[in-house]
């Protein structure tokens, strides 16, 4: 993997990588991973730059110490120069010119040292400002990358929510079909009850020559079976009415959840929980409808036995 001499080169490379588009797709996920790896390398470079800043500050402190030492040296030399001037005044036989040249040379060296320290301090300040600017650019690029990843996660969450809503609609359609079948079976049970009543009336009219006890016993059995069939039918219709109301509530809640999902992406978690609860209620309604349909079928299966009894009564 390529390394970077400066953070500025890394930031330029990162800007060139993300300037091609604002949104990521599945084909660019590998590129995002590479950019995250580059970001780690940039963080290492930033840490190195911070270390350089620390060293620069340390060098600055050392330069300031050298400057203080140079100032002390200048003061000491000035004092020595004063002393030597006094000595020159007191001792005119000494070589004044040589002493002055030595002191002047030392003063020149001190001035050069002070000038060099000032230049190094200026360079260090410029370097620190440049490093701060590069660090800000890296942090800005990192923030933009995080925003892109967050937008991608939000988009995926919305797609998942739409898929779950579609599944919920499919389940509602299945429930409606089951409900229609149950209503049809209940209607068949009602027709069977009417048919049983008619046959019972015919059997009663045709049984004038039978004994009264036999007629009463047969009629009681038919009425008992008819009452059971009517109770089962009423219970089935009542359950179906409740199922229809609950299905309408589920539809209304589903539409409300869809509106909430379109109005705000932040409500995805709430809608998900609501859809799960509604699906659970829909499953319960389906189970109850199946149980009612099963009981209706069992009652319908028991009808042939009563019909055979009526046939026997007619023959008698």
Swiss-Prot record:
UniProt keywords, alphabetically: Coiled coil
Chain coiled-coil ranges: 42-90, 119-195, 233-266
Region (Disordered): 295-316
Transmembrane segments: none
Presence of the UniProt keyword Coiled coil in the record: yes
Protein family: Belongs to the WEB family.
Tagged with keyword Coiled coil: yes
Protein name: WEB family protein At3g13190
């Amino acid at each position: 993997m390529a390394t970077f001499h400066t953070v500025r080169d890394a930031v330029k490379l990162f800007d060139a990588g993300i300037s091609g588009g604002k949104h990521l797709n599945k084909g660019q996920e590998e590129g995002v991973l590479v950019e995250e790896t580059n970001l780690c390398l940039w963080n290492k470079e930033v840490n190195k730059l911070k270390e350089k800043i620390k060293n620069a500050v340390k060098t600055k402190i050392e330069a300031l110490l050298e400057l203080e030492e140079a100032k002390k040296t200048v003061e000491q030399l000035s004092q020595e120069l004063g002393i030597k001037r006094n000595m020159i005044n007191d001792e005119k036989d000494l070589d004044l010119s040589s002493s002055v040249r030595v002191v002047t040379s030392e003063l020149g060296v001190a001035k050069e040292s002070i000038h060099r320290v000032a230049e190094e301090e200026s360079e260090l300040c410029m370097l620190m400002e440049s490093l701060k600017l590069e660090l800000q650019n890296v942090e800005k690029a990192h923030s933009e990358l995080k925003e892109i990843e967050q937008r991608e996660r939000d988009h995926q969450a919305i797609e998942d929510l739409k898929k779950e809503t579609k599944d919920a609609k499919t389940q509602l359609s299945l429930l409606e079909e089951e409900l229609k079948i149950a209503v049809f079976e209940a209607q068949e049970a009602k027709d069977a009850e009417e048919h049983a009543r008619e046959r019972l009336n015919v059997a009663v009219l045709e049984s004038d020559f039978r004994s009264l006890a036999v007629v009463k016993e047969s009629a009681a059995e038919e009425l008992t079976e008819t009452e059971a069939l009517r109770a089962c039918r009423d219970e089935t219709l009542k359950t179906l009415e409740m199922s229809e109301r609950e299905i309408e509530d589920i539809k209304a809640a589903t539409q409300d959840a869809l509106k909430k999902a379109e109005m705000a992406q932040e409500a995805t978690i709430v809608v998900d929980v609501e859809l799960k609860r509604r699906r659970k209620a829909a499953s319960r309604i389906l189970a109850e409808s199946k149980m009612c349909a099963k009981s209706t079928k069992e009652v319908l299966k028991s009808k042939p036995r009563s019909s055979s009894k009526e046939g026997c009564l007619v023959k008698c």
